[in-house]
């Protein structure tokens, strides 16, 4: 078929190609209809009709035949023809409204909740949920999920607490084997130090370190790292204090594993004449107090409102329940001036540290007449470790605490401390320490919970000289996000916290800084399969 339009736009001729149809001529008066308008109309229809056909086919496939009215068809076709968006935004607004309505409704008792998304979809289909019922079930599922997650987190913290308080099998084996060696091997019982070095133990020309611990492996790392990192190892004297049950094993280790040219002395608490009940009555009271025993050895969850406690707060409370905090070994640092009456200046080290830098310059630090050289713990990049002020350790709702302490005062750290014993002996630090321990016992431990640092923060008030933070980096036992570059630069790194490097819960990427000083070639270490 051919379409012919005359140049004057006054006639249109349609003829068939096979000439079976006669020529058709259409003549239209120009005054009634514009031929140009007619041409444009036909042209537009030629473009639109294919799209209308395609759209109709699509709508048919989507089920337009199910519509029972022209209005239904209009709702389906109208937005497509007019370019309007679908109803998803309106549906979302309606669903938000329903969610707000059910957020304050009480969830019915005995409501059976799906265990998975697929089960939820199946229940919706089988039970013909309306939107409100679906929203209520969804809310109940989310609340149950949050409770389960919270309970799992607290269970994890409890398990971590018990793991941190336990003695690893390898370390227990090491202690037993070395104790047996002490009884059967005369060399393991040799005098420490040798008789010719006994005068050095009270010679203030040497650099005296004090370490109080019942962990033989940890003690070996502290001593080895300090000696290997020192520019003057021949000036180092270590005074190691341990309890009676560990004394034989500790003595055996250092008798059989020399750290020459450094000198090591091992003493048990039972060998100090000064440590009598008359001199430390408050510690006996602490150990025998029923409230203390229940607090440290009782049910760690009883009385704790877990719904109002954050995991971080719960973790801190668990750490404060470590049995080591009522151990005499942990309180011994407050008696250093009496235990070492001939020494003028010492550095006290915890057993969970590693010495990476030369500590010789510490003996040249001027404490300005103060007793205790320590790093602050309220300034630094680490918000978890370096954000400690007195409010983090004390209960300021207690009138005595509120009266004597400032909650915003910066705290300082134990772990690596320089003690001027001459200045210390002129103070009443020990008496103040005992006095506040008694007050806390009277208050049934309501003034503070966390170990030996709180009474020390009070007792040393006004006697602390702040040293540069590069000397002592804390927190390697708290979190895995510790900055590795800062770890490498620190003179002393401190694994304070539950994740000790000798435990399986220790952080793998931080452990090598500690294991570097473990002598894995030692027969006792190998036979006890330490950290294997």
Curated annotation (Swiss-Prot):
Residues 62-532 are lumenal. The chain crosses the membrane at residues 41-61. GO terms for cellular component: Golgi apparatus; Golgi membrane; pollen tube. It is found in: Golgi apparatus membrane. Disruption phenotype: No obvious phenotype. Increased galacturonic acid and Gal content in cell wall, but reduced xylose and rhamnose content. The gaut13 gaut14 double mutant is defective in male gametophyte function; swollen pollen tubes disturbed in elongation, and characterized by a disorganized outer layer cell wall with an altered repartition of pectin (e.g. homogalacturonan). It is a single-pass type II membrane protein. Residues 1-40 are cytoplasmic. It comes from the Eukaryota. One of its GO terms (molecular function) is polygalacturonate 4-alpha-galacturonosyltransferase activity. InterPro entries: GAUT, Glyco_trans_8, Nucleotide-diphossugar_trans. Glycans are attached at residues 305, 395, 444, 519. Pathway: Glycan metabolism; pectin biosynthesis. Expressed in roots, inflorescences, siliques, leaves and stems. Accumulates in pollen grains. Its EC number is 2.4.1.-. GO terms for biological process: cell wall pectin biosynthetic process; mucilage pectin biosynthetic process; pollen development; pollen tube growth. Keywords: Cell wall biogenesis/degradation, Glycoprotein, Glycosyltransferase, Golgi apparatus, Membrane, Signal-anchor, Transferase, Transmembrane, Transmembrane helix. It is an enzyme of class 2 (transferase). Belongs to the glycosyltransferase 8 family. PANTHER family: GALACTURONOSYLTRANSFERASE 14-RELATED, GALACTURONOSYLTRANSFERASE 4-RELATED. May be involved in pectin and/or xylans biosynthesis in cell walls. Together with GAUT13, required for pollen tube growth, possibly through the regulation of pectin biosynthesis and repartition in the pollen tube wall. This is Probable galacturonosyltransferase 14. It comes from Arabidopsis thaliana (Mouse-ear cress). The lineage of its organism: Eukaryota, Viridiplantae, Streptophyta, Embryophyta, Tracheophyta.
